[in-house]
Amino acid sequence: MDMNLILSSIGVFLVVILLLVVILLVAKKFLVPSGNVKLTINGETGLEVESGSTLLNTLAVNGVFLSSACGGKGSCGQCKCQVLEGGGEILPSEVPHFSRKQQQDHWRLGCQVKVKSDMAIKIDESVLGVKEWECEVISNKNVATFIKEFIVALPKGEHMDFIPGSYAQIKIPKFSMDYDKDIDKSLIGEEYLPAWEKFGLLGLKCKNEEETIRAYSMANYPAEGDRIMLTVRIATPPFKPKEQGPGFMDVMPGIASSYIFTLKPGDKVIMSGPYGDFHPIFDSNKEMMWIGGGAGMAPLRAQIMHLTKTLHTTDRKMSYFYGDRALNEVFYLEDFLQIEKDFPNFTFHLALDRPDPAADAAGVKYTPGFVHNVIYETYLKNHEAPEDIEYYMCGPGPMSKAVEKMLDDLGVPAQNLMFDNFGG
């Protein structure tokens, strides 16, 4: 083949590539927004911000942190705000999160709105109180087979004002980890490690290829100091069908819980908060009932401890129904039994899935059965007015759905049920 022809072909190819690059650069210059624009918040705060990113990220860079449990992927629907000017038309990815009335009132998802020009937005005033810190892990021990009590300290001199029931967000960096090598087995504990080995959890691996964010309810209450305490359940892959033998399906475990389970005292993490509106109604005299299960313990503990230990509430009838598989999975039990002794208006009710010889031997009072059935059979069935109780619930999805149906059947109005349904 003629060498000149080959060289000519290569030359033409390179020229075409260079022309395409030039066209792309010119298009980017004219089509992609650049430079600074003005962002007005709640009609008062005017920020000069760089255009081109999402509203969620732009606000975060400027110290305003909208909630975003999904890390800005448009699935959780928590980064809601009103874009009064400069937001363009609502996107198809946003429509399922809003009613027609909300769309007419300019509600948008911050993670889906691009900052292209001057913009005016309206956000809840409480969002302006959200802060972000680099925190230090001070404890990360298992309190149940698959649940850790994860505690971090805020930087010295920092403080977070929050209402019990709020949640915090944690940044999950890029990582690649091996459960067997990277999880400190001493922090799992001798009581729970055999179950990890039995179910093969130590053979799991996890990789996160992009930085993201996850939200967890806080278990601490304000009087416990400048710290954040979470109860985090490891999100394992589903088990294989029986016909395929033992072990997990070939699916990666949860990114956020895997990361948290690798952390040790002294490690640094990026946290922000407070977020959320799952808060007790303080200016009420109605009876209160908390309903929880598994890691859903967190916000309920915070609320109960605050109402008893801090506010010394004695003029409202209060009860807490907590459901779990077995006694060795129940944590903070002694705290609630002590509150029951100190506050005659408070009762703690433990529901275990089935009769538990360990609980019987320890003399721990419980009722066998799922928590929604236990609530109905032992309390609400003969209650004069279950529709007048305020219910606060947090737990796995199936539990939450069963409780919702039970309360609906009893005629409890929707506004009397406050819940933080983390779905699993």
Where do the protein language model's features map onto the residues?
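Cysteine-centered iron-sulfur cluster-binding motifs in ferredoxin-type domains/subunits
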Residues: 68-77, 110-114
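Ferredoxin-reductase
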Residues: 138-265, 324-325, 351-355
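Fe-S ferredoxin-like electron-transfer domains
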Residues: 19-26, 30, 96-153, 158
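Short coil-to-beta-strand transition motifs
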Residues: 126-135, 207-214, 330
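A short, basic/flexible loop-to-alpha-helix module at the beginning of a structural domain
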Residues: 259, 272-286, 381
